[in-house]
Regions:
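Short conserved beta-strand and strand-loop elements enriched in small hydrophobics
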Residues: 50-53, 124-133, 192, 241-243, ...
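Cleavable N-terminal signal peptides of Sec/SRP-targeted secreted and luminal proteins
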Residues: 4-20
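A residue-level signal for conserved active-site and pocket-lining positions in enzyme catalytic cores
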Residues: 65, 128, 159-160, 196, ...
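Signature of the N-terminal lobe/flap region of pepsin-like aspartyl proteases
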Residues: 42-146, 284-296
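Aspartyl protease catalytic domain
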Residues: 20-43, 129-249, 336-348
Length: 437
């Protein structure tokens, strides 16, 4: 009986160890498998990412096609965690289910237009009255209400809203108040304005955190600068969107960045062609003036002659884990068909491991982590694609089986020897009769 119990116990221990290993590496294995599957669906000139609110069942997919000279995007509000299928034989106007197709037009002026992701059923309109003043050129992109549950407070997430107002920051404040008044956004959302002189790029999200200790209180109130305690922000901002029958023409950018002590570590990467003095523009807006020095301005056409090694490496310190991270500005650029494009890149998150995007083919896997305030936030981590090989999984399973058999054989042999020895000792035992005294 003891022999059977011992073997069962050992097998249970082995099963526990095996299952623990597989559980720890399950996301990697599945990520590799997913990457392999997606590779057959999406060519290498695609970026696939998502905005998620609360869970994988509430995501807005962005499937960005890097196609010269056009950039195309396919977005869908979907109710399952499966990847949407893409038919490469069809054009960029391909639609399936709830797919909405956006087609890029020529870049429009940076100021004077407003684009809003309409999550609350706000009626589409070309104008919006703010403080008794009508602002035109407003486009609302309607998204199914199922995309966000009725109780926004129960689902964490970050929503992107890009404002391009020629009037400046003060009018952005009016717009936010108007949107709250019309229940387009919740009263508890927060927003970030980089600098007073900077127009646009206003990020909408949830759960305002305390202002970083390095902010002066009056400065924080003046610039409305909040921090997520060094965690990753990201927003998807659309500029110059115009309704055109069933299609929407656009010029867009995607940003993913982190904030430390009020310093914007990563300028918003622009997915369209760099046709302006990118770094100089951001430095003059106060992004990196003190920390990074004065960069030489350049345009997209002459980036091939730029010595990226001359740019300093930006470092930032994470208080909670007592570590310093850094990145180089050259990581922002990806050379595609002889031209440089500035791509979305992953900053870092200590809870999700450090990751970077360096212009390689990359795909995604779903991640969930908990904020310091215990609010869950889910999103798709963008990661370099990894070749998936079925034989690695087979080898892993075979190795575990072989190890289990070896342990079983060793235990079986030792137990058998022990029983044999016990029998021999029992045979050598002589009965000594009890003497009556």
């Amino acid at each position: 009986m003891n022999y059977i119990n011992m073997n069962i116990l050992l097998l249970l221990c082995l099963s526990f160890i095996s299952s623990s290993y597989i559980s720890l590496h399950f996301d990697t294995l599945i990520g590799n498998l997913t990457s392999s599957n997606i590779k057959n669906i999406l060519p290498y000139n695609y970026i696939y990412t998502s905005i998620c609110v609360g869970s994988p069942s509430q995501c807005f997919n962005l499937n960005i096609e890097l196609q010269n000279p056009l950039l195309s995007i396919i977005g869908s509000s979907y109710n399952s965690s499966s990847y949407p299928k893409y038919d490469s034989s069809k054009s960029s106007t391909y639609k399936e289910g709830e797919y909405k197709t956006f087609k890029r037009s020529e870049p429009a002026p940076l100021e004077g237009e407003i684009v809003i992701f309409n999550f609350a059923g706000y009626e589409s309109t070309d104008t919006l009255t703010i403080a008794d003043k009508t602002i035109s050129n407003i486009s609302f992109i309607n998204v199914d209400k199922n995309f966000i549950s009725d109780n926004l407070k129960e689902n964490s997430g970050i929503l992107g809203l890009d404002l391009r107002l020629s009037e400046g920051v003060s009018k952005e404040m009016m717009l936010i108040n108007q949107l709250k008044k019309n229940n387009v956004i919740d009263d508890d959302v927060f927003y970030i304005e980089y600098k007073d002189e900077h127009k646009g790029n206003l990020i909408i999200g949830e759960y305002p955190h305390k202002v970083s200790s390095s902010f002066k209180e009056e400065n924080a109130k003046e610039t409305y600068a909040y921090t997520f305690l060094n965690e990753v922000f990201w927003g998807i901002n659309f500029n110059s969107i115009k309704l055109n029958n069933s299609e929407i023409e656009y010029d867009f950018k995607v940003s993913m960045f982190s904030i430390e002590s009020g310093f914007i570590l990563a300028p918003n990467p622009v997915l369209t062609q760099l046709n302006k003095t990118f770094f100089k523009d951001y430095i003059e807006k106060g992004f990196c003036k003190e920390e990074a020095g004065d960069f030489e301005s350049f345009s997209c056409e002459d980036t091939n002659n730029v010595n990226f090694e001359s740019f300093p490496t930006l470092s930032f310190y994470h208080k909670e884990i007592n570590m310093t991270f850094s990145f180089d500005y050259s990581d922002l650029f990806y050379k595609f068909e002889g031209r440089r494009y500035c791509l979305i890149f992953g900053n870092y998150d200590p809870f999700l491991d450090t990751y970077w995007i360096l212009g390689k083919p990359f795909f995604i896997k779903y991640k969930t982590f908990f904020r310091p305030d215990s609010k869950r936030i889910g999103f798709y981590e963008i990661e370099p694609s990894k070749p998936f090989n079925f034989w690695w999984i087979l080898l892993l399973v075979a190795s575990l089986i072989i190890i289990g058999l070896l342990i079983y054989i060793v235990v079986f042999v030792l137990t058998k020897k022990r029983k044999k020895r016990a029998i021999e000792l029992d045979d050598d035992y002589e009965y000594i009769p009890k003497l009556n005294v």
